[in-house]
């Protein structure tokens, strides 16, 4: 049955506050939720705010479903703001009411919807089976979390302290919290010089294990939303981890790492969850839900950060892009590395095409094409990229990438256990796409009908017409279990439509149209063994932003040779400096409230000069080249240093955006290639492409705009 999607209200970017209808001028009260959207509260708690105008704060009274909570009100960061941490909310809807005791102001009411701490909220039914990993989760102070306390893999929340010593090591703080003699101090980005002691909270939300960290000396008052640690710069960095294969059916044994010197030393708070590591859970929807719940927990503990920065490479970039676009307000800016737009399309298209091509070159027609010709057909700059990516393509096979924690007897087998757990990308996204008509396999938005593989190689004379026709005649496709078959793969049209309208295929016109994006890349295209992290994918994201918004000046690309630090948080490296500059960009944009200009205008004019498209020369003393980055293999200094090699679908004539799931077709005879064919070749071409070849000039089949943001499944 197909997934059912409901659109909920779009969130105000940069906050969680849900606005009430505008009231008449005069004294009034306004309620909002600071810790999350009002409709996605979890765990029974919510940090709320009452903004007062023309009313004495001492006259304000607040109740939840008739229960007076006025005694919990605290003064906020401004005289006209009152705040309270509401606890004990039942599951479902509750009505919060704020009114003036002397009837001096218009009252306000806000409905909040609370969900279980174990979820789900908007990601759909929990996946089963689900293997707990708490007993293997290593704590910052050593040891593990131990066994879970329920079937949802929950643990009791705990707080530990570590400190950094003068030798650059993190150690557990003594139980009596006295300051060790070798304690280091750090100076934060705001100039505070504080003991380098870190408060680490570990717990569970949405069945994942989360960690948060923040500079805090336990000899000072316990932090809460109104008592913030001296060393916190009021920024939260949310870290997203990479991976994808084997990322299903497990809780996960590590987050993306919150005891991060490069961040903590500058005063940033850090958060992550095991379900925000794609190697544990390769599902952007569940990642968004987990982040929402963990950030909510953080805000209830420390107050709302001024800004939240998303930070992730590879599988972490998938999350940063899609959370930023589909669930706006969770991040205010993102720094990505080794990026792709998303896993389900840009990546899957490339690696499954590589699988088909490699099988053809090595098994179907061995010896027919030289390695140079294979490179011309695939587009890759290094031949070994082809087998490397072909292996990665097995993530669509339900039998290959099962996590070690998943018992063999629970795994899918077509004969022995047809109802077992299917270990593939599409089965892990069944809440979105639903099951096919048989009920045994997920719907798949995967298609290669009409794709003229090797078209550019043909037009450039690298291969002959007969070579081109044989390749396309025998390349084949995949059945529901990713067995290689002679026929091409046909997409499920319902799944294809869902992919576009829900943002599973990154649109770029949702929340990403309102935040700064920094794309860092330590170049991997020339890796001798091949590498999946191709530079072209960053340009696919940029092209989607251009198509959605008409401009891309909120997107910056930085490229350097690998081996100079890579994607890390050390401020002495390019990526580490980029985080500081992203912070400055977000901060300056927020301070620019000129109503005469669009959000993108304000982002563009507040971009730090350092954050300009650039690459660095190779070698021990790299020099910066300030140059617009382009998707070319030559024609500029950066393109010469770091060529942008195409994917098989680009070689087949596809768009740079890589956003067509299933192409519309045109008769081969109506193309330039068709005009070159002999009568014999034309007869074969009609058999090879019975429905025609892709007409990439038209939108894809079922291609449609984003339905909205904050969708529920």
What does each model-identified segment do?
Residues 12-28:
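C-terminal region of N-terminal signal peptides and the immediate post-cleavage residues
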């Amino acid at each position: 049955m197909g997934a059912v999607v409901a659109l909920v209200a779009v969130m105000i970017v940069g906050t969680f506050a849900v606005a009430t209808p505008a009231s008449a001028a005069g004294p009034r009260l306004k309620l909002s939720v600071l810790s999350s959207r009002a409709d996605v509260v979890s765990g029974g708690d919510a940090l709320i705010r009452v903004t007062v105008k023309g009313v004495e704060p001492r006259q304000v009274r607040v109740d939840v479903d008739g229960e007076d909570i006025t005694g919990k009100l605290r003064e906020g960061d401004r005289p006209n703001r009152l705040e309270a941490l509401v606890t004990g909310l039942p599951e479902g809807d509750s009505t919060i009411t704020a009114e003036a005791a002397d009837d001096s102001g218009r009252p306000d009411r806000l409905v909040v919807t609370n969900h279980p701490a174990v979820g789900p909220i908007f990601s759909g039914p929990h996946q089963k089976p689900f293997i707990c990993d708490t007993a293997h989760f290593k704590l910052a102070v050593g040891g593990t979390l131990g066994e879970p306390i329920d079937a949802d893999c929950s643990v009791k929340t705990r707080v530990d302290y570590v400190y950094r010593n003068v030798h650059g090591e993190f150690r557990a703080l003594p139980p009596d919290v006295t300051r060790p003699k070798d304690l280091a101090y750090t100076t934060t980005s705001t100039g505070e010089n504080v003991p380098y002691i870190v408060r680490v909270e570990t717990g569970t939300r949405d069945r994942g294990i989360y960690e948060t960290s923040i500079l805090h000396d336990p000899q000072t008052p316990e932090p809460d939303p109104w008592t913030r640690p001296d060393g916190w710069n009021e920024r939260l960095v949310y870290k997203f981890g990479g991976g994808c294969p084997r990322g299903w059916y497990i809780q996960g044994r590590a987050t993306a790492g919150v005891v991060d010197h490069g961040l903590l030393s500058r005063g940033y708070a850090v958060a992550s969850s095991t379900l925000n590591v794609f190697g544990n859970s390769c599902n952007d929807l569940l990642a968004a839900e987990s982040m929402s719940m963990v950030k909510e927990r953080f805000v209830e503990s420390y107050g709302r950060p001024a800004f939240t920065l998303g930070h992730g490479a590879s599988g972490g970039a998938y999350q940063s892009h899609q959370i930023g676009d589909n669930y706006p307000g969770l991040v205010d800016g993102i720094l990505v590395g080794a990026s792709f737009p998303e896993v389900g399309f840009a990546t899957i298209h490339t690696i499954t095409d590589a699988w088909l091509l490699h099988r053809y070159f090595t098994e179907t027609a061995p010896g027919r094409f030289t390695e140079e010709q294979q490179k011309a057909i695939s587009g890759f700059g290094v031949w070994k990229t082809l087998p490397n990516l072909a292996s990665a393509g097995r993530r669509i096979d339900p039998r290959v990438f099962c996590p070690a924690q998943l018992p063999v007897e629970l795994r899918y087998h077509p004969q022995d256990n047809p109802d077992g757990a299917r270990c593939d990308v599409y089965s892990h996204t069944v809440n979105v796409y639903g099951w096919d008509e048989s009920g045994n396999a997920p719907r798949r938005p995967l298609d290669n009908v009409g794709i003229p593989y090797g078209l550019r190689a043909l037009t450039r004379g690298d291969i002959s017409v007969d070579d081109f026709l044989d390749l396309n005649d025998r390349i084949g496709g995949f059945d529901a279990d990713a067995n290689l078959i002679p026929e091409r793969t046909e997409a499920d049209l319902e799944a294809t439509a869902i992919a576009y309208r829900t943002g599973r295929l990154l649109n770029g016109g949702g929340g990403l149209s309102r935040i700064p994006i920094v794309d860092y890349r330590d170049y991997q295209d020339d890796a001798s063994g091949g590498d999946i992290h191709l530079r072209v994918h960053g340009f696919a994201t940029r092209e989607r932003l251009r198509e959605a918004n008409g401009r891309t000046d909120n997107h910056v690309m930085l490229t350097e040779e690998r081996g100079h630090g890579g994607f890390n948080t050390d401020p002495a490296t390019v990526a580490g400096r980029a985080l500081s500059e992203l912070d400055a960009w977000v901060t300056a944009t927020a301070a620019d409230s000129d109503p005469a200009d669009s959000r993108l205008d304000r982002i563009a004019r507040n971009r730090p000069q350092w954050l300009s498209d650039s690459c660095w020369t190779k070698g021990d003393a790299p020099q910066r080249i300030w140059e617009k980055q382009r998707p070319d293999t030559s024609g500029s200094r950066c393109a010469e240093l770091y060529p942008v090699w195409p994917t098989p679908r680009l070689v087949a004539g596809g768009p740079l955006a890589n956003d067509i799931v299933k192409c519309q077709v045109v008769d081969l005879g109506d193309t330039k290639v068709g005009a070159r064919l002999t009568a014999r070749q034309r007869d074969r071409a009609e058999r090879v492409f019975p429905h025609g070849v892709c007409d990439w000039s038209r939108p894809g089949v079922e291609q449609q705009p984003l339905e909205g943001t904050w969708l529920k499944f």
